Amino acid sequence: MKGQEMSLELGLIGNGKIAALIDSRAEVVWCCMPRFDADPVFCSLLAGADRDLAGGFSVSLVDASSFEQSYLPNTPIIVTRVSNDRGDEIEITDFCPRFERSGKLYAPPILARQVKRTTGNPLVQVSLRVSEDYGCSHREAVVHKHAVDFPGKYPLTLKSSGQPLSMDVPHPVTASHTMSFVFGGRDAVADAPPFEQLLEETLAYWHVWSAALKLPGDFVDAVTRAAITLELNAYPETGGIIAAITTSIPEAPNTGRNWDYRYCWPRDAYFVVNALGRLGDVRTSARYLHFLLRVAEAGGSSLLVPMYSVDGGPIPEEQTADCLAGFRGMGPVRIGNKASVQAQNDIYGEAILTAEPLFRARRGEEVGEDPVSARAGDRTLFTRLEQFGEHAARLYDQPDAGLWELRGTTRVHTFSSMMCWAACDRLASYAEAVGLAERARYWSERAIAMHEVISKRCWNPKKKAFTAAMEGESLDASLLLIPRLRFVPATDERFVQTVDAIERELKHGDFIYRYVEQDDFGHPENAFLVCTFWYIEALAAIGGTRRAEALALFNRVLAARNKHGLLAEDLDTRTLEQWGNYPQTYCMSGIIDCALTLAGQAIV
């Protein structure tokens, strides 16, 4: 809308194949088709002051003055109620279809919208601008009576039901009819069932999915919303899990810290499948692990890279989309991510820890359709994971860019070293679980030797803390994960002292910064939100009076979510405004982990 500054007060709809962001006035401001990392068809989110010229899909009530928006409970279906001062009111329902159809998951690349009259005699105007080439051009529209075609490399269609469709012309919406729209790939739209069936079956699907979650006694709504959001970032065709559906929303204003997160990071995915696994969803772990093993073995060397496209292929070389001004005009808008070519040694640990829910599951229990071996952890899966363990044992004391993906320097990061240790430690437990005593001894001996080196070289006796790197002086927030990795227990004096040091150096108000030292882009300005969730987990694990602190802080952090219960990557600690790519799976995983930990469930 002209004159309205873009914010992250946005709702998310999706189905795992695509996703879209909808603003408070029911305009679709971001959507890529036919998959998460494709060219955006709607991109006014990143168009700056030119958002009215960028791609978007709006359904507007003439003379609208009031807007109310919320999710239907336990679903990713958004309802927006719009009214004006004359007493006219409409209800707009937005979703992406997802349900079982002919024994398979039906999640087509389409958006579904419906407009209903609730009171008065509303006039509604539909506006659809389809972007191409990252905002450099628009698709030409070919208008038919009940459809609009948008030819191109990936042909798109808008199909309407009800009265004949005229774009940008006010339509009356009467009590006797509704306006329904299905927009997306031409073939997908042609194959779609009637709108009411799409809505009813999608609603039923998510009610069943949500009911299967093993929820804590408290924070039920927050955890359910977080779990649904994570599931929307899991690509069902391959099992890949993206970090966020957006690119280039700045971590802080005018910093240039604008990154493309529409890809699959083994690190981020570990946190996602771990959180969902704690809620009882083991299938997502199995599908993702199959994805990871497939991409590793496809290269012939079992080496992993920091990120993949949703189909398991390489991501594009980083470039800028110069036709888009950026979020609030704060470019650049990036496509691809240079961090994909970095050394990030922790990824082998995360790959192995991802399998932990499978080895905890009952032997022989079906956990997925893909041949991982499609069963809970067994000897075949264990043997395939050992290749990652060998890389971890080789790399644990080697320099890398670390989990913060520093672009200008490498060092032996403590988190990477400990994650490599965790890889060997877990392989020992997996081997024991499947009755391979010799392999259990092998991996246990490697883990013990690594633990001794890391304990000596990553502990700074003068600082009385584990440090960010071997023989280092500085801190970073990943050290809060030490008990989760089981390197030392939360009650170990070294960890307690490390938390004390982090509070002194990295805590600003309620929030934890990932680090405070200068990097390639200067000093970090906003808090990286997941670090605060790690801090809450650490306090809860330490116990005693710190547990009450953790609970109080968790409630305050939850209050920083937007009205939809969603969080971006970063937060301005003074204004509590969200920044960074949105919604971010790291943060939504953090909500689940903290709620379960505070409910007494062990960190896994």
Stretches found by the model and what they are:
Residues 1-604:
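Acidic, mature catalytic/reactive cores of soluble proteins
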